[in-house]
Amino acid sequence: MKTQFVILMITVILMQMLVQTEGGILGKLWEGFKSIVGKRGLNDRDQLDDLFDSDLSDADIKLLKEMFK
């Protein structure tokens, strides 16, 4: 009975260590993914939002339309 209890306690401790380590690893992977994609990539944005920017001139819009034909 004592042996089973010791094995159970060691298993519980190892499982807790695994869960804490996995959370750290998954957290770091998620941070890396977010830094690669960036803020705009994770937002639900239309790709044509820049066309409505007031800083774009008519020539810029014409060039963009030619590029995407």
From Swiss-Prot:
Point out the signal peptide segment. Answer: 1-23
Q: What is this protein's name?
A: Pantinin-1
Q: Name one GO cellular component term.
A: other organism cell membrane
Keyword Repeat part of the UniProt annotation? no
Q: What is the lineage of its organism?
A: Eukaryota, Metazoa, Ecdysozoa, Arthropoda, Chelicerata
Q: Where Valine amide occurs, residue numbers?
A: V37
What does the record give as the function of this protein?
Amphipathic peptide that possesses relatively strong activities against Gram-positive bacteria and a fungus, but has very weak antimicrobial activities against Gram-negative bacteria. Also exhibits very low hemolytic activities against human erythrocytes (64 uM induce 21% of hemolysis).
Q: Give the subcellular location.
A: Secreted; Target cell membrane
What tissue specificity is annotated for this entry? Answer: Expressed by the venom gland.
**Family the UniProt entry places it in:** Belongs to the non-disulfide-bridged peptide (NDBP) superfamily. Short antimicrobial peptide (group 4) family.
The protein's organism comes out as Pandinus imperator
